[in-house]
Amino acid sequence: MKKTSLPLVTLFALSVLILSACTSSGAASTSPVGEWTLVTYGDASNPTPALPDVETTINFNDDGTFGGSVGCNSFGSDYKVDGDQITFGSIVSTMMFCEGISDQESTVLGILTDKTVSFSMNDDQLTLTSEDGNSVVVLARK
C-alpha cells in the first residue's frame, strides 16, 4: 500500500505546484506594464485634457524600461516600482520643436524625469501624481 501511495502523493503535489504556477498573482493588476495613452495632465485640481490631435503614449516594459512619444519627440528611460511609488531615471529624448504642443510635452516629461511619483490604477486608467501632489498625468490603457 505504501508503494502505491507515494507516487500518488508525489503526483498530487506536482499537480498542485504546476497549477499554482499558472494562476495569476494579484500583483499583475497593479503593474504599469503595458502601453498607455495620455488623457489629462497638469494641475491636479484642474487637469488639462490631452490635445486631441497629438497622440502621447508611454509604454512600460517588464524589464524596467519605458519609452514613448509626446507627439513630437520620442523618449525613454528606466523605472522602478516600489509599492505605490515609481522612480524614474533620467530621460533620453529627441529635441525637435513642434509648435502648439510644448506645454503638454514639457509637463508630461517633467513628471517623468528623475523623480519618484505615486501611482494608482483604476480599471484601465493609470494616474501618476507628483511628490507634492500638485501635478498629475492620467493615462488610459491602449
Located regions from the model:
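Lipid interaction determinants
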Residues: 2-142
